[in-house]
C-alpha cells in the first residue's frame, strides 16, 4: 500500500488513517481544502465514532492532479459540497465518488462546510460529464445496488433531475 486517499475529511473516512499509516508506511492524501480536517476532528466526534485522530496529510491534491499507483492513474476531480475539499477519483471508466454521489442519491450537505448548490454544481460539471458507462463506486452503499453508472444516475437519481 503506497497511498491512503481520503475523498474528504469526515471522521468515518479518516479514522483508519493512523493505523493504516503505522502498519504500511503509506502516505496520506487529501484535497488541500480538507487537510485541516484530518487533524482537527473534535474529541467528542472521535469518541462518538470510537475513532482515532488522523495524522496530518503527507500530500495535498487539487483538481486535475494525477495520483499514480503502479500502472493505474487516478485523476482528481474536485467535487466539493459534502465538504469543501471533497474529491472523486476517475480512472479508465471508473469513478470513486466518496460521499458526493451515491447510487440514486447524493451526499448530505447539512454539516459544516457543506453546500447543496456547490455539490449539485460539482456533480453536474465534473461527474455527469463523464462517459455514461462510467462505473460509479460510492463511499457508502446507500442504494439498492452497490454500484451504478453515470448514465443510470442521470436517468434515475431523483436529486439530479
What is each of the regions a protein language model found here?
Residues 42-45, 51, 73-78, 83-161:
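Metallo-beta-lactamase
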Residues 1-69, 155:
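Active-site HxH/HxHxD metal-binding segment of metal-dependent hydrolases
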Amino acid at each position: 500500500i503506497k497511498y491512503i486517499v481520503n475523498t474528504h475529511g469526515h471522521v468515518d473516512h479518516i479514522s483508519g488513517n493512523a493505523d493504516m499509516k503505522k502498519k504500511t508506511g503509506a502516505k496520506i492524501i487529501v484535497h488541500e481544502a480538507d487537510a485541516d480536517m484530518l487533524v482537527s476532528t473534535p474529541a467528542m466526534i472521535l469518541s462518538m465514532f470510537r475513532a482515532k485522530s488522523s495524522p496530518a496529510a503527507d500530500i495535498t491534491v487539487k483538481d486535475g492532479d494525477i495520483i499514480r499507483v503502479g500502472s493505474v492513474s487516478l485523476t482528481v476531480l474536485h467535487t466539493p459540497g459534502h465538504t469543501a475539499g471533497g474529491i472523486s477519483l476517475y480512472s479508465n471508466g471508473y469513478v470513486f465518488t466518496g460521499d458526493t454521489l451515491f447510487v440514486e442519491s447524493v451526499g448530505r450537505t447539512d454539516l459544516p462546510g457543506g453546500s447543496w448548490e456547490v455539490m449539485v454544481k460539482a456533480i453536474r460539471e465534473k461527474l455527469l460529464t463523464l462517459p455514461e458507462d462510467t462505473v460509479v463506486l460510492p463511499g457508502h452503499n446507500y442504494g439498492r445496488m452497490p454500484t451504478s453508472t453515470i448514465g443510470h444516475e442521470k436517468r434515475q437519481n431523483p436529486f439530479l433531475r
